[in-house]
From Swiss-Prot:
It comes from Arabidopsis thaliana (Mouse-ear cress). Expressed in root meristem, shoot apex and flower buds. CDD domains: MCM3 (cd17754). SUPFAM superfamilies: Nucleic acid-binding proteins, P-loop containing nucleoside triphosphate hydrolases. This is DNA replication licensing factor MCM3. It is found in: Nucleus. Signal peptide: none annotated. One of its GO terms (cellular component) is THO complex.
Amino acid sequence: MDVPEETRLRHKRDFIQFLDSMYMEEIKALVHQKRHRLIINISDIHHHFREVASRILKNPNEYMQSFCDAATEATRAIDPKYLKEGELVLVGFEGYFVSRVVTPRELLSDFIGSMVCVEGIVTKCSLVRPKVVKSVHFCPSTGEFTNRDYRDITSHAGLPTGSVYPTRDDKGNLLVTEYGLCKYKDHQTLSIQEVPENAAPGQLPRSVDVIAEDDLVDSCKPGDRVSVFGIYKALPGKSKGSVNGVFRTILIANNIALLNKEANAPIYTKQDLDNIKNIARRDDAFDLLARSLAPSIYGHAWIKKAVVLLMLGGVEKNLKNGTHLRGDINMMMVGDPSVAKSQLLRAIMNIAPLAISTTGRGSSGVGLTAAVTSDQETGERRLEAGAMVLADKGIVCIDEFDKMNDQDRVAIHEVMEQQTVTIAKAGIHASLNARCSVVAAANPIYGTYDRSLTPTKNIGLPDSLLSRFDLLFIVLDQMDAGIDSMISEHVLRMHRYKNDRGEAGPDGSLPYAREDNAESEMFVKYNQTLHGKKKRGQTHDKTLTIKFLKKYIHYAKHRITPKLTDEASERIAEAYADLRNAGSDTKTGGTLPITARTLETIIRLATAHAKMKLSSEVTKADAEAALKLMNFAIYHQELTEMDDREQEERQREQAEQERTPSGRRGNQRRNNEDGAENDTANVDSETADPMEVDEPSVEQFSGTVSAARIETFERVFGQHMRTHRLDDISIADIETVVNNNGVGASRYSADEIMALLEKLQDDNKVMISDGKVHII
């Protein structure tokens, strides 16, 4: 609106007095740093003249031009030559806006025409364009120059003017525009979206367009969390001959402040800090945090521990030579359906301060990284941030990772290691930060995990991608009656539980309510329905509340920066060398390739464990804890336990067969065959009736070969085939392999090896033909 001259001059005198009394040092610093915007704290205005502060917030258009004139005059009083003719010192605001600190969702029509502070994350940035402020035109006929000023809705110097260039003067003479004498200012539009962790569940995130001009352009980039101070205005719709009552709203910025990682930090009470330190001093702190992560999920203790370390993260470092050392931990879970992989992702979403969820089929490469889009109104190119850029310094959860296209999966390679997104499209070259942890869940390539194949063949992902995951867990659906009984009991307790108000649980479609920052309860209260009956002589395993767990993880993640000690460095280097040797040995076969990235993984895990203990140093104990987790992820113990149970079942079946009469007859037949093994006729009879030969041979040696030697043979033989990726091998080579690599006091005889191979053939695991063993 157009402010009367008398009112504007009165406000100018008041503001000059205010600046002389409180902001002379800031104005001198402005001149010294060659800036053209003075930032004023609204609290200082409130202390100087209380009533004016509230009027500035409610009706800023009346005061903005007076403030700029006062700041310009105060600057000229300090240095008359600092500003050129026609230049102004712009004014921006900061401070505590009380009820006017809003998110894009809360920015309603009540705030139109007033000054607000909008907090959110930048999702789109347009290119910086020049906007004309003053045009100069020359008339060749008269030799005179004509000036024209331009104002739009973003200007505070009066009513908006037309934007049409004059082509003739008042007398009808032609005018020529002198572009070199015209004045322009930088202009850029941004899109601010509400932060993902504060978005209402089940609803699309809201956004607001922001106009940044002059020195505010390029002050932020997509993915940055910002507080934008500005005036909320409504723009009339472009209607063709009809009246449109719906208006488009924009925010005209006068100050943009970047939010740091502590912006959304919870408020800690003294009791909270004492409780956090008490938990860190406990010997079972790691187990307690893992148990509290997702108490509704039974088992998976090692995976829960890995998730705790993942949320804490390591220490990010940027060396002087420009090298970036990643501190975030990436994790992947592969396994059978219905083993709570997706539920673990949901638990991360519920606890992590910043987490964005997506799925493999519903995500594209540009949707995860960044995209170059066209503005619907101007048609110009603009950069739009993807999920990983929006989750900067957070966690990205990708479910159904195996369903993602190969082209889209390649797009996240750079993010997972370099933690940046580089775009070079449509004339735009930019590099955006994407410092996030990736947690992926996938099913095996055949639907269920095939234990006879290597982990790499089951997963079906390239090594270039697998090596970027610090941890790879194989989650199996074990058919165990005891475990199944405990899982069913646990799940039934979950379904029977109701909270104190008798409700089954919160509805995801309820309006979002911000979490209070009051003192948090430490432990979950015992509930017989939820936690089960206490057994005699057994205490209830306590779990932390979700609110306190969030505070603990946030405190340990952002307040603690551990440093590696010499003894921890030596232990990590020694363990890495052992892992490399084991990776090249024929006795072992891990889920992940052992590369130099594995060494950095151990360092990150040890650092995260030190954070969990609130320690300023990474000790040898932290390195040992990281190595235990690393060994479980690489040489997954669940596979060995499952094979042991199958081996025990086979031994029981063999023992029962030995006690039957057919077993005794088989032994007698086997002895007769051994006595005539050089007879050609007997060899022909063996090939004519293979069933009579295979069965007794197994029964003969199953009674004489110990269970340990049987297990060693199958383990060494299977690992040799997986390590060298062989489909067939000669029996002579098998004898060499098992006798050179087997752990035992005596060597395997040829008959012993043949009997064991025939047993594998009966189990449909191998096929023996022409002196060769083929893997089925």
